[in-house]
């Protein structure tokens, strides 16, 4: 009965709402002015580092990657073969039948937040809804939610409450713009080879559950009309999360360009007005140019900027070399590489979001925990060179060239290896931090060449290595600032603290 009421309300709702947009006026400048919105919150400028996770029904197979829900329906894909061997033919055992298998029986929000805080994160997030149509909160919009099915727990509620108890900001990420089946079996002459690859997550096939007319299955697989989707589902879920969980950041994955502008505007207006009422600074992350910069912030994926940006920006990395969700064969990245990514991002006026990949039962594997704790150990010593800093006049120097581009070159970014001669700079007050992306040889004289342009302006008082009690011998020359490298422990980046008057 409860599911029937969900569906009845959903399909009666959109008809009365469509007409409201006929005379709807959109003024993106006005919307930010009226809400007195700052798209670059000071707390986020100071925070620098957040941790979030991809975790949901797609974690159950622990195979391939988080697009398993889509690829399991494609007969030419390895995911289809795997699903057929382990669960049954997707025609009979669809993604909907995986939902009860996501039990999260060992999920402990406090343990997760404790871990993220020990790792040095200043905000925490979660994928609120991926492309798969399953909401990770107690939803009245869709029956496909974890409070009603699977774990029967309000995951976002438990997690966000713990974040707030720990004094951490809350981020929710939304990927549900792709849920709507936009083309089904129609022709797309403008994209003859790829029309069904990306714009809709679940492939429409008359042989598969994705084409079912069952009211429940239609909701999960996005087999609904645009009128049934944009207002009551896409926008409705966002409003529900804002009302019930009060996130500080809302992140959108790609494909916002597929959402009609009036719905983007209504979301933005709702979120910013809600923040104003609550007297809180919030942020909206978006990829590409799907929202104006006066109301949003750019986020990159597995890539970074070449130079210092005047506006605050963000990028997301994952703890593995490939999948965002847990898989049995996932290969993990080294903590020292992720520390260097964080340093590089911060030196260019950026913020890093690091993704972790819990198992479907709610355990974050020990190998991932060790990486996080290594990052936290480094930040415990060197955090003053990261948190609350701002870019110097130049981001850094050194022999290593960075790939050009965004996600299309993410594999090249992954291969990037820095040396001890690669340096990144941050600043706070009258202090400049020179961070080497490796450990230089003890006793070596190292020259920070970027200081040669600052000889007349800077009056250096002391140079030291953070974590060491000894002062470092230094000399300001026409080549730059020369320092003698002391003996240091560990294999991670070291920070020279240069105190000026």
Where are these regions (language model features)?
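Bacterial Sec-dependent N-terminal signal peptides
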Residues: 1-22
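Mature catalytic domains of secreted/periplasmic carbohydrate-active enzymes
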Residues: 20-501
